[in-house]
Amino acid sequence: MAVPKRRTSKKVKNQRRTHKKLHVPGMVECSNCGELTKPHRVCKSCGHYDGKEVVNG
């Protein structure tokens, strides 16, 4: 069975995990109501996308 020969230091362990962080999604302002939404998606508050109403009510 494989067993580590030396203890993994905190530095090496943390360097290996640098890509496991959470990323904050980019947000854009809705052109109709000004609400923050994810880009290329329909606004949840007003239902507009690309300057047109897509969802009613």
Curated annotation (Swiss-Prot):
Pfam families: Ribosomal_L32p. Keywords: Ribonucleoprotein, Ribosomal protein. One of its GO terms (molecular function) is structural constituent of ribosome. One of its GO terms (biological process) is translation. The keyword Ribonucleoprotein applies. InterPro entries: Ribosomal_bL32 (IPR002677), Ribosomal_bL32_bact (IPR044957), Ribosomal_zn-bd (IPR011332). One of its GO terms (cellular component) is large ribosomal subunit. Belongs to the bacterial ribosomal protein bL32 family. This is Large ribosomal subunit protein bL32. It comes from Oceanobacillus iheyensis (strain DSM 14371 / CIP 107618 / JCM 11309 / KCTC 3954 / HTE831). The lineage of its organism: Bacteria, Bacillati, Bacillota, Bacilli, Bacillales.
